[in-house]
Every structure is written in C-alpha cells, then in structure tokens.
Curated annotation (Swiss-Prot):
Assembly, per entry: Associates with pre-60S ribosomal particles.
Protein name in UniProt: 60S ribosomal export protein NMD3
Keywords noted in UniProt: Cytoplasm, Nucleus, Protein transport, Transport
InterPro entries: Nmd3, Nmd3_N, NMD3_OB, NMD_SH3
Source organism (scientific name): Xenopus tropicalis
Protein family per UniProt: Belongs to the NMD3 family.
Function: Acts as an adapter for the XPO1/CRM1-mediated export of the 60S ribosomal subunit.
Length: 504
C-alpha cells in the first residue's frame, strides 16, 4: 500500500496569558494586549492637559521662553508649538503620528491626537493612541503691553524744518505713503514745526532716516538715553532719538548764494530761484536761465537762506513782454534750462494801478506770460533785506523785481480738482488756522510740477466729473492717466455695496 505524502505545514501554537489565561500567540511578555495595557501605560508621564498662551491684541502664540509667533489654527506651525510643550516627556517614547482634532474656534481648546510606541517587558513593542488637550489662555505680549501703557516706543525720528509753512511735510507724507514706510510706525505725531515718528525698534527708525536722506536734503544727529540695566545679564535698555533737520529752502524761494558757492556752480548769479526740492535743491538764475543743483552736504558747508517769506509775494500785472533770442553764454558757465524761455517784461503792481510806476526785469517765465496776465513776484526795490551776502553785492546787480510764478484763480482750481490724496493717521497738536491754505499751495505745486508728481500716488475723486486737462485760463491740471483708482474693499466689482459673507 502506498501513502501519498502531502506538503509539510507548520502551525504556531498558542499559549495562555499569564494574567487572564486566554490563549494568545506567543509574545515576549506572555500577556495579552488587554492585560499588558493594564500593567504598563506607555503614556505615563505625558501630561494630558497643557496650557498655551495667546495674545488677543496681535493674535500671536507664546513660544517659550519669550518669543511670540503668528500661527493659524490647525497649521503645522501651531502643531510644532504644541509638540514642543511635550518635548521633554516625548523623549522616552517614539512619536509615530500627531494631528489636530477639530474643535470650535471660540472654545479656547486645542486637541492633538498622538500615536506613540514604546518597548516594554522583554522587548515587546506597545503602541498607544491618546489625546492631549491644550487650554488657550490669554496673555498680553510685551509689545502690546507697551502700546497699552503708552510707553511702548524704543526709537523716535524727529523731523524739523525751520520755515513758516508745512509744504515740505505734506510732500514727505505722500512719499512715505507711496513707499509704505508708515506701516512700521507705532505713532505719528504732528507738531507746529515738524513730525515725530515713533518705532518699536531702532532698526526701523534708522530705515526711516535713510529714506529721508534719499528724499530731501537733510542732516541728522543720533542720541540715546539709558532706561534700565540688568546687572545680572549685563543687558541695557535704551531709547534712541534721531533728530533730522531739513534744509530751510523750499520751492519758489528767492535765495542769495555766497560768492564762493555761486562760482563753484558755474559762475552763476548769486540771486537765484529755487524751482524744486527733491534729494537736491534745484536752482535757476532768472536772468540767464542757468541751472544748478545743490546737495545736502554742499548746503551745510555753504548755507544760504530764503530772502522772503511766501506771504510776501506780491501780485503784478504784465504790461509788455519781449522774448530774448540772442543769449551769449559766458566762459565757464553751467547748464541752461530747456524748459523755460528767457524774456524781458514790464510789470506793474496791482495795488499801484492808479500810478505810473512800472518795473522792468528779466524772467524765466517767458513761455507762460502774456500782456495782461497776473504774476506773483518779490519786490526787491522797496524792501529791507537782512542777508549777509546780498548786503555785500553791488546794488546795480540786484534786480528790482523777481517774478516767481504765474497767478491763477484759486477758487476755480479747487472746484475743478478731480483728484485727491491719502493721509497718514497722526496725532495733531497746535493746529494752525493757516494749514488749509498751505495744503492748497502744496496741491497747486503738484499740478505745476510733473517731476514731483512722479513721487506721489494721486487718486481719482469719483465725486467730481472728469474734465479736460487745462481750463480756459491755461492753469495746469493733472491728467487722468496720472491718477490711480482708489480701492475700497467694501465695494463689489459693480461699484455697489458687496453682499454679506456666507457663513455656512
């Protein structure tokens, strides 16, 4: 008789659990899973409830010992912060998985599901899943605490200019808005002779000073005051102050240069008009159209002041004009302006129309003036000037009248102005009743100077209709192509109020 031999099969026998006696596959601990978990808790020592600190003002979480970080709910950054709270306890086990369990955002609770493994009796590896509750506790961070205590700034930039108007600061405000340098400021304070910018760090204040040096001719002086000192850690707490002084020369100012400076600028006449102030002072000689630029360092080495205040501008009426065609340029002379036309004009004060007194002068406004036009200028023949340079000049070289700019009807210009500017939120004190007139002067300067407009964001005013670029009088206006659309988040694409946000 033959027997068929089948394939040999091996089967693993079961053993009895040493605790409860149920049959189980053999394992190093000789225990079932239930008994093993009753005997050993691998999550022992890991806290099941932990607190995290959250600042409601800036919506940041505290990462010990003293760092505050921005984290979104159920983000990887927040999960990392939560696991770091358990870092010391998790060092004895192996972390397999971690993830958030959804909780109500307003419940002040965060739940993290952890999966861990650990080697227990006789080399058996046990895996366990459990949940850690994180209680979100409110705590104000140091930065917000300083803000609420009104003693939060660590650096201040004090910008000053020794003039009787604020047109320079209106221009600085617009350039700061264009480059968004106001975002790091904690507070902006406006006083009668300048602006104060407060910052939480010295680096932001230094950045503002560097920007001012690139925008206007200025100089600064830095100082600091010791607030506190920790003798154990040798840490010092300072408050820094940067005092920035802008040159006291503005657009449409009449200045008298020193003979040495005038010679270094191409042998130009000492009496000049400031036509623009950017990072340098732009000067023009109204009798020759010679132009020159003076930077901040050159100005502080050879300073000069304005001979007149803008309120001393007088109104003249043009009686006759004659364009100067033949212009001879002296040896060593500098560049001449191509945007202006030299002319000889006869003018008469509008306040002296009942007399026969007329004045003859040369002007750089030959491309704008016609007989009968009104023009603003300074009367040098009937005034007392207290300036060291002009007092030493030959009286025959001093003109009787210097014309500055053409005069237009201000009321019509304001009514037809279909654009607007944004402003920086700031604290005001010592407001002057003349501020509105000075602001209108600044707006007129923007309309007249295209170079300055390139550094300013100009927005369309939807409340006013769009008209032609020039009016009947020829007053300069800003074209529609130079304006930006003012964005309002609350408006939808059609210009109406947007619909409510869906919450379901």
């Amino acid at each position: 008789m033959e027997y068929m031999k089948g394939p040999a099969t091996s089967s693993q026998g079961n053993i009895l659990c040493c605790q409860c006696g149920i049959p189980i596959p053999p394992n190093p601990a000789n225990m079932c899973v239930s008994c093993l978990r009753m005997q050993v808790d691998i999550s022992e020592g890991i806290p099941k409830q932990v607190s995290v600190h959250f600042c409601k003002q800036c919506e940041r979480y505290l990462q010990p010992p003293g760092t505050w970080i921005q984290c979104a709910l159920e983000s990887r950054e927040l999960l990392t912060l939560c696991l770091k709270k358990l870092k010391a306890n998790l060092s004895k086990v192996r972390l397999i998985d971690a993830g958030f369990i959804w909780t109500e955002p307003h419940s002040k609770r965060l739940k993290v599901k952890l999966t861990i493994q650990k080697e227990v009796m006789n080399g058996a590896i046990l895996q366990q899943v459990f949940v850690v509750d994180y209680i979100v506790q409110s705590q104000m961070c140091d930065d917000c605490h300083r803000v609420e205590a009104k003693d939060f700034w660590k650096a201040v930039v004090q910008v000053r200019q020794k003039v009787l108007h604020k047109k320079t600061f209106y221009y600085l405000e617009q350039t700061i808005l264009k480059h968004r340098l106001h975002q790091n400021t904690l507070r902006v304070k406006e006083i009668h002779d300048g602006l104060d910018f407060y910052y939480a760090s010295k680096q932001h204040a230094q950045k503002m000073v560097e920007f001012l040096q690139c925008t206007v001719p200025c100089r600064f002086k830095a100082s600091q005051r010791l607030i506190s000192h920790d003798i154990h850690t040798n840490a010092y707490n300072y408050k820094s102050t940067f005092s920035v002084e802008i040159v006291p020369v503005c657009k449409d100012n009449l200045v008298c240069l020193s003979p040495k400076l005038a010679q270094s600028l191409g042998n130009m006449n000492q009496i000049c008009i400031c036509v623009r102030v950017t990072s340098t002072i732009h000067l023009i000689d109204p009798s020759t159209l010679q132009i020159a630029e003076v930077d901040g360092n050159t100005y502080w080495r050879s300073p000069f002041n304005s001979l007149f205040h803008p309120k001393q501008l007088e109104e003249f009426i043009v009686m006759d004009t004659d364009i100067v065609r033949d212009r001879k340029q002296a040896a060593g002379a500098g560049m001449r302006s191509n945007k202006h036309i030299l002319a000889e004009v006869w003018v008469q004060k509008t306040s002296e129309m009942n007399t026969t007194q007329q004045y003859h002068c040369r002007t750089h406004l030959g491309h704008l003036l016609n007989p009968g036009d009104l023009v603003l200028g300074f009367d040098l023949a009937n005034c007392n000037l207290n300036d060291e340079f002009i007092n030493k000049m030959n009286p025959h070289h001093i003109p009787d009248v210097v014309l500055i700019k053409k005069s237009y009807d201000r009321t019509k210009r304001q009514r037809r102005r279909n654009w607007k500017l944004k402003e920086i939120e700031r604290d005001r004190e010592g407001m002057d009743t003349d501020d509105e007139r000075q602001y209108q002067d600044f707006l007129e300067d923007l309309e007249e100077d295209e170079v300055i407009r390139k550094n300013v964001n100009i927005y369309k005013n939807a409340n006013l209709p769009v008209e032609s670029d020039t009016d009947e009088e020829g007053a300069p206006r800003i074209s529609l192509a130079e304006m930006l659309e003012d964005l309002h988040i609350s408006l939808d694409a059609t210009g109406g109020e947007g619909a409510e946000m869906l919450t379901e």
